[in-house]
Amino acid sequence: MSDNWVVQNLQNALDTWNSKLAEIWQILTQSPENFKGGGIWQVIVQIHGALQAIGYALLVLFFVVGVVKTCGSFTEVKRPEHALKIFIRFAIAKGVVTYGLELMMALFNIVQGVTSTIMKTAGFGSTEDTVLPDEIIKAVEDCGFFESIPLWAVTLIGGLFITVLSFIMIMSVYGRFFRLYLYTAIAPIPLSSFAGEPSQNIGKSFLKSYAAVCLEGAIVVLACIIFSLFAESPPVVDPDAAAVTMVWSYIGELIFNMLVLVGAVKMSDRVVREMIGL
């Protein structure tokens, strides 16, 4: 690495960005069971198991309310076809509550398969690192003390922007993982609503929302791939321009590309919800 302070500051900001991008790539290919050593998942599974008791109680409640609202009289309940329909609904709802964790992990694994297919098709095993062009390093190193003063200001502003954007992006990806945990922990309660016909929309909405959170990972991977292709063709640097102009032009275009990626990551939940009509 160069001994120049301006170059070091810019390179440190880019290193932060590259490390966060690599961390995102690693998180998106991980299962909730293995995330952070699996300690969080064990607690979530325990909470899920404890809430199953409440889920079974609500299952009976939703079932009774559903029978009362859908049947005009007790005579209808005694009809074989109607009784069979009610029994099948209750059995399915109980199965969904009992095996809710397995159902949700199956959904997650399907989406992970989609994400892996996108990565393999695009030919990306990891993200491309963003590096400082040699022309800028040489121009900055050739600057005198007074010429480098405006460069310090430009570098500080640019480095701060890049660092802030990298943390905003990683927070969005971590937020998705936390939502996966929240959905998994509380799943028995909304899934119990399948026992009653009037309340079944609660369960449907819950599963749709969970699927949307899972699909966010695929959207984020697509955004990272597009940004990596941008990074392969870095901003054009005019070698005849002044050092300050070169740095300012490079940082401006780079931050614009980064803003596009951060915006895509932040809006991934909205994009998915529009896709599946939530």
Question: Which role does the model predict for each range below?
Answer:
Residues 1-10, 80-100, 203-213:
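Alpha-helical transmembrane segments and their helix-start/interface "positive-inside/aromatic belt" motifs
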Residues 1-58:
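Binding/recognition "hotspot" determinant
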Residues 94-186, 220, 224-277:
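Non-cytosolic segments of integral membrane proteins
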Residues 58-94, 186-200:
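Hydrophobic transmembrane alpha-helix segments characteristic of membrane transport
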Residues 53-65, 157-163, 180:
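Hydrophobic alpha-helical transmembrane segments
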Residues 44-52, 84-88, 92, 141, ...:
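Alpha-helical membrane-interface segments at transmembrane helix boundaries
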Residues 23-26, 82-89, 109, 116, ...:
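Short amphipathic alpha-helical coupling elements at transmembrane boundaries
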Residues 191-208, 240, 271-277:
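Alpha-helical transmembrane segments
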